[in-house]
């Protein structure tokens, strides 16, 4: 199957699974929170993170759908982080993926709760995964928590806020973005290997690939904030001008080369897998993305 066909098939599988999560909760009194959560969860997007989980599971020799609970959990956590990022007390954004942000539609209080629900429910979804070795559920949950929590994505957000009023060093920017963006790309890759009953060497390869891909992804985001089209991005551009971004640190031309360098290094980490062609094409496609 060609790359685009496989990517489309993965997205369709992921969309169906995500749509089923809150639908299975029934007509509870808390239905408004399901609607608010679904508004953002089902808003589309690249579905990069869940796609990575499915492909790493497949490349380790298992049915990729066995990784769906992990894939969905990561996407739920990613979505909660976007809802909270958009709040007035954080980035104060009005648009996300071409439509009004969650708090603009449902109010700030409900948006906070929708994010909280997505984060909390994500762990229940992940815990339902049926692994070849059931004992590895605990390992998977621990990895997910660490990548999303104070040592991972949240930690990166904290460092970002703390450094907002000063210029950061190269190492500080790398540390912020490795946590803030990179760790939630590491999670689905490693969880996909766990779902696929992969080896320790494959877990390490997946983590290395994801860490480097995460940096390339963030640098491309920083580039698009400067040169991207707001219509294509589905959100405002130029909002990171005062932040400690890679573009501010290195300049546009150097960042374009850095994206290529980090992507090449990420692809090199895939040598422990039998057929990394899909992951290679996926990584390369991200270097030229417009949104």
What does each model-identified segment do?
Residues 1-291:
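All-alpha prenyltransferase/terpene-synthase fold signal
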């Amino acid at each position: 199957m060609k790359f685009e066909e496989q990517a489309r098939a993965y997205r369709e599988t992921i969309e169906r699974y995500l749509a089923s999560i809150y639908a299975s909760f029934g007509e509870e009194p808390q239905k408004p929170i399901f609607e608010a959560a679904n508004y953002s969860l089902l808003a589309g997007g690249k579905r990069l993170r869940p796609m990575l989980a499915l492909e790493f599971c497949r490349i380790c020799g298992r049915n990729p759908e066995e990784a769906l609970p992990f894939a969905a959990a990561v996407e739920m956590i990613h979505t909660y982080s976007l809802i909270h990022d958009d709040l007035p007390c954080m980035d104060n954004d009005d648009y996300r993926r071409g439509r009004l942000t969650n708090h603009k539609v449902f109010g700030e209080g409900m948006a906070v709760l929708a994010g909280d629900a997505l984060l909390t429910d994500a762990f229940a979804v992940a815990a339902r995964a049926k692994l070849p070795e059931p004992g590895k559920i605990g390992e998977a949950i621990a990895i997910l928590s660490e990548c999303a929590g104070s040592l991972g994505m949240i930690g990166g957000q904290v460092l970002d806020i703390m450094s907002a009023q000063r210029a950061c060093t190269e190492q500080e920017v790398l540390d912020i973005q490795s946590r803030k963006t990179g760790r939630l790309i590491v999670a689905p890759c490693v969880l996909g290997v766990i779902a696929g009953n992969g080896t320790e060497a494959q877990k390490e390869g997946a983590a290395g690939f994801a860490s480097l891909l995460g940096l390339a992804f963030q640098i491309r985001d920083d580039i698009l904030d400067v040169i991207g089209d707001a219509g294509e991005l589905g959100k405002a551009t130029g909002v990171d001008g005062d932040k400690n971004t890679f573009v501010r640190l290195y300049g546009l031309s150097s960042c374009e080369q850095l994206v290529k360098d980090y992507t090449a290094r990420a692809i090199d980490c895939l040598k422990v897998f039998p057929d990394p062609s899909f992951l290679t094409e996926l990584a390369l496609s991200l270097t030229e993305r417009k949104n």
